[in-house]
């Protein structure tokens, strides 16, 4: 399996996921690619788009520490708090959404994040049988339309990654 980074629709870095040989997880590969992009290649970018499998606290907090914006759908079993500490954590799927929050997103704390670290969460209807809960560390982002556009870009990148992974597997 490949993990890829794209810049203007071109591949700029990839890693072959082979933990038996290198002992690295997919998260380790992504973090190493980010380190390379920021500190070695000095590639200018400001946003990281990720799939749910990469939306782990360690990686989201690392991206935030780089002063980069992230967008990632969270798994529906993630626990979040939208009460600012007044209530216990709830499953994302059980959150209640006002009409305003459906348009503008809502501020939540993800369980395991530092006490003062919040994200903006958007409820994105993907299809009649699928809803994504997309988190971003850009707390000023207040448009479901912008979030949906970002999600479409992420999906196009995902399609390219799937194609390239299939192609690489046929070459071996």
Segments (PLM) and residue ranges:
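Single, function-defining residue in the core of a domain
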Residues: 6-172
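Short beta-strand scaffold segments in enzyme catalytic cores
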Residues: 1-2
